[in-house]
């Protein structure tokens, strides 16, 4: 469940900032297949990937994080 929430948020911010999966994966230094697994909720992103994604998207990791329930 948590992986799905992270995946949806990462995908939404990626699209909002105009990145393709290929371009975003390259900027993060990961494969497109790993990014796809994260965005589909099949893989929980590591803390390093979360921070790298926030940096590439020019947002804070807190903004990228799912809201507290």
UniProtKB/Swiss-Prot annotation:
Keywords attached to this Swiss-Prot or TrEMBL record, sorted alphabetically, are:
DNA-binding, Transcription, Transcription regulation
**Entry keyword annotation includes Signal:** no
Transcription: present as a keyword of the record? yes
Q: Which SMART domains match?
A: HTH_XRE
Q: Where are the transmembrane segments?
A: none
SUPFAM superfamilies membership: lambda repressor-like DNA-binding domains
Please give the CDD domains that the UniProt record associates with this protein.
Answer: HTH_XRE
Q: Name one GO biological process term.
A: regulation of DNA-templated transcription
Q: Which residues form the HTH cro/C1-type domain?
A: 10-64
Q: Which GO terms describe its molecular function?
A: DNA binding; DNA-binding transcription factor activity
Residue range(s) of DNA binding per entry: 21-40
Protein's name according to its UniProt entry: Uncharacterized HTH-type transcriptional regulator YazB
- This chain's source organism reads Bacillus subtilis (strain 168)
Encoding gene, per UniProt annotation: yazB
